[in-house]
UniProtKB/Swiss-Prot annotation:
<dbReference type="InterPro" id="IPR036390">
    <property type="entry name" value="WH_DNA-bd_sf"/>
</dbReference>
<keyword id="KW-0159">Chromosome partition</keyword>
<dbReference type="GO" id="GO:0005737">
    <property type="term" value="C:cytoplasm"/>
</dbReference>
<dbReference type="Pfam" id="PF04079">
    <property type="entry name" value="SMC_ScpB"/>
</dbReference>
<keyword id="KW-0132">Cell division</keyword>
<comment type="subunit">
    <text>Homodimer. Homodimerization may be required to stabilize the binding of ScpA to the Smc head domains. Component of a cohesin-like complex composed of ScpA, ScpB and the Smc homodimer, in which ScpA and ScpB bind to the head domain of Smc. The presence of the three proteins is required for the association of the complex with DNA.</text>
</comment>
<comment type="function">
    <text>Participates in chromosomal partition during cell division. May act via the formation of a condensin-like complex containing Smc and ScpA that pull DNA away from mid-cell into both cell halves.</text>
</comment>
<comment type="similarity">
    <text>Belongs to the ScpB family.</text>
</comment>
<dbReference type="GO" id="GO:0051304">
    <property type="term" value="P:chromosome separation"/>
</dbReference>
<dbReference type="GO" id="GO:0051301">
    <property type="term" value="P:cell division"/>
</dbReference>
<dbReference type="InterPro" id="IPR036388">
    <property type="entry name" value="WH-like_DNA-bd_sf"/>
</dbReference>
<dbReference type="GO" id="GO:0006260">
    <property type="term" value="P:DNA replication"/>
</dbReference>
<protein>
    <recommendedName>
        <fullName>Segregation and condensation protein B</fullName>
    </recommendedName>
</protein>
<keyword id="KW-0963">Cytoplasm</keyword>
<keyword id="KW-0131">Cell cycle</keyword>
<dbReference type="InterPro" id="IPR005234">
    <property type="entry name" value="ScpB_csome_segregation"/>
</dbReference>
Length: 185
């Protein structure tokens, strides 16, 4: 890979992962030495800053993450401001069902089941206090694990997760692999 391809790959990895990644993790994924990764990241940080892009690469100890630039906070705040009386989308409902049946579960595992990104759905569910962060996995990147809340039980009038209906009881026509993924524990 040439240097531009390495930069492109690092940007894609940091974007897709969303949590901080170490140089060691990037080195293993790209099969490139840590010193070269470190040099490329330093160049990328300078390039992102010089071109005043909307995103930046931030360094936290030996970890790196993509982040929006602080000067765009007011725009993002408007975008993500809680909206009153907003319903729940089909995507959020699907995400909630997966979390309810598979918890504790990571965002990546949810996305593998759904086949699409779920950032907005998770954000909505957190905002409505139907799910919560229940910690982090002790593996590379330390991904957040999600589970349902007491509010989830209250909203859906169930006393415990043991009272969730069996997925096989639903008369739904979905890809049987998806149904199997959700139901298998």
């Amino acid at each position: 890979m040439d240097r531009d391809e390495i930069k492109s790959a690092i940007e894609a990895i940091l974007f897709a992962w969303s949590d901080p990644l170490s140089i060691k993790d990037l080195s293993e994924v790209l099969d490139i030495g840590t010193k070269e990764i470190e040099g490329v990241l330093a160049e990328m940080i300078n390039e992102f800053n010089y071109s005043k892009r909307g995103i930046q690469i931030i360094k936290m100890n030996d970890y790196y993450q993509l982040s929006t630039r602080p000067e765009h906070y007011e725009y993002l705040q408007k975008l993500f401001a809680p909206k009153q009386n907003r319903g729940i989308t089909q995507a959020a409902l699907e995400t909630l069902a997966i979390i309810a049946y598979k918890q504790p579960i990571t965002k990546t595992e949810i996305e593998e089941i759904r086949g699409v990104k779920c950032d907005k759905a998770i954000s909505t569910l957190l905002e409505k206090e139907l799910i919560e962060e229940q910690g982090r996995l002790e593996k590379t990147g330390r991904p957040i694990i999600y589970g349902t809340t007491i509010n989830f039980l209250k909203v859906f009038s169930i006393s415990s997760l043991d009272n969730l209906p069996n997925v096989s009881d639903f008369n739904i026509s979905v890809d049987s692999d998806i149904l199997k993924d959700i139901y298998e524990k």
